[in-house]
């Protein structure tokens, strides 16, 4: 077996295969998961001209939005952790959109200090746990806890980098969103779209996807159950993710 073939097999044991790209995540604290896939499939991208992914991790969201957006759209991904940012660079380089994605290994505060508001869409699957029980590695604590990237800092940096008519999209647990939304409103954000997600159609929502705007408009609310009453993937979930999941 060639070194290249062996390398590809190793990647496929340590990552996630989508229809058009592969995400290796063995060097990332947070692996590919449903939250990120939902956000990447849902975020409104039709009028995007330039996209920013904050806390990119493996580069999943940047890759999903590259697949969904027009060929002229440029995507920047910012990731503080050096191992994760390197893996995001490798994932992007191996994808069909290598010339459209740029990965920056730095924190969002430093990144935003050097740039102007020229992003039409900003997306983030942010840390949302307050500091608590040790995770076993500093890398995982950084990805899970709001110690280094608080929601206030995230909102402030996104506000600084977003074009006036742009959207800032995040995914959060329902309980966290109850505190995040009032904080966002204090920073002059308005919820333009909200998708509440439940594991099953007869269960309460456990995640919320938000599209925030600097413009005040009436909020449009949606519901999505991942599985139906028979515990099969729901039609809505399949429709949303069919361009990505291999067997949808």
From Swiss-Prot:
Native source species: Pectobacterium atrosepticum (strain SCRI 1043 / ATCC BAA-672) (Erwinia carotovora subsp. atroseptica)
Role played: Specifically methylates the adenine in position 37 of tRNA(1)(Val) (anticodon cmo5UAC).
Chief place of localization: cytoplasm
Biological process per Gene Ontology, one example term: tRNA processing
Similarity comment: family membership: Belongs to the methyltransferase superfamily. tRNA (adenine-N(6)-)-methyltransferase family.
Keyword entries, A-Z: Cytoplasm, Methyltransferase, S-adenosyl-L-methionine, Transferase, tRNA processing
GO molecular function, one term: tRNA (adenine-N6)-methyltransferase activity
Protein name: tRNA1(Val) (adenine(37)-N6)-methyltransferase
Catalytic activity: adenosine(37) in tRNA1(Val) + S-adenosyl-L-methionine = N(6)-methyladenosine(37) in tRNA1(Val) + S-adenosyl-L-homocysteine + H(+)
Gene Ontology, cellular component aspect: cytoplasm
Cell compartments where the protein resides: Cytoplasm
């Amino acid at each position: 077996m060639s070194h290249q073939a062996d390398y590809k097999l190793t990647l496929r044991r340590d990552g996630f295969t989508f229809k058009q790209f592969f995400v290796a995540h063995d060097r990332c604290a947070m692996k590919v998961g449903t939250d990120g896939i939902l956000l990447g499939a849902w975020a409104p991208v039709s009028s995007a001209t330039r996209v920013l992914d904050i806390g990119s991790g493996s580069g999943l969201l940047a890759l999903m939005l590259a697949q969904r957006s027009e060929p002229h759209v440029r995507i920047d991904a910012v990731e503080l952790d050096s191992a994760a940012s390197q893996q995001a660079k490798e994932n992007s380089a191996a994808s069909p959109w290598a010339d459209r994605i740029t990965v920056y290994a730095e924190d969002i505060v430093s990144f935003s200090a050097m740039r102007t508001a020229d992003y039409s869409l900003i997306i983030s699957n942010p840390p949302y746990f307050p500091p608590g029980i040790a995770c076993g590695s500093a890398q995982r604590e950084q990805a899970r806890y709001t110690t280094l990237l608080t929601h206030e800092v995230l909102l402030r940096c996104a506000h600084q980098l977003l074009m006036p008519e742009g959207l800032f999209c995040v995914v959060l647990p329902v309980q966290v969103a109850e505190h995040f939304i009032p904080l966002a409103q204090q920073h002059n954000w308005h919820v333009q779209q909200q998708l509440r997600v439940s594991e099953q159609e007869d269960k309460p929502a456990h995640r919320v996807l938000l599209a925030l705007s600097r413009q005040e408009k009436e909020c449009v609310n949606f519901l999505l159950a991942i599985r139906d009453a028979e515990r099969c993937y729901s039609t809505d979930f399949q429709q949303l993710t069919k361009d990505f999941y291999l067997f949808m």
